[in-house]
Amino acid sequence: NKLFQLPITYYTEADQWSNSPGLRADKIVTDKPVTSRCLECHTSFAEAISGPPLEPMEFDHNKIILGVDCERCHGPGARHVEFQTKNPQEKSAKFIVNPASLSRQLQLDACALCHGSNLKKTKPSFQFTTGKNLADYFTISSLNDNAVNNGNIDVHGNQYGLMAASKCFRMSQQL
């Protein structure tokens, strides 16, 4: 029930294989664990079965749905699906988060879960959902200027921090 990252990844847009994010080009690593922090963004329904609550190490692989899905941005959907299935004539979505109805900060928090790498957990994994305040679940570190200046930001770079630090973003109340 432990998960490990493959050392290479196929990028469909580029139609090529490359080193997986976070791995060095000069060393093949086959034992890099996939952590709960990875699963919070890249799966749904990950359920920890062992390890400390902040960083469990084993997961029920029968329940995990791989990839980014609707729940990442719209919150838990079971009640929504159940209601809409029983009420197909209802055209107004019920029991689901419409990100457009959230405050600017809550919209940003939903994105920052996966696009703000400088997050340190303060509550157990898999508790944050869209519509909640990210700061209640994570300590949000400021943008690391050294990483920006040295070009050390990869796919897991702090896109949220980069955007929030931009003049355009700071001068606007819109997203």
What do the PLM-derived regions correspond to, one by one?
Residues N1, Q5-P7, N19-R24, E47-L175:
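Primarily the internal scaffold of c-type cytochrome electron-transfer domains
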Residues N1-Q5, D31-A48:
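N-terminal export/assembly segments and adjacent metallocofactor-ligating motifs
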Residues P7-P33:
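Extended active-site and interfacial segments that coordinate phosphate-rich ligands
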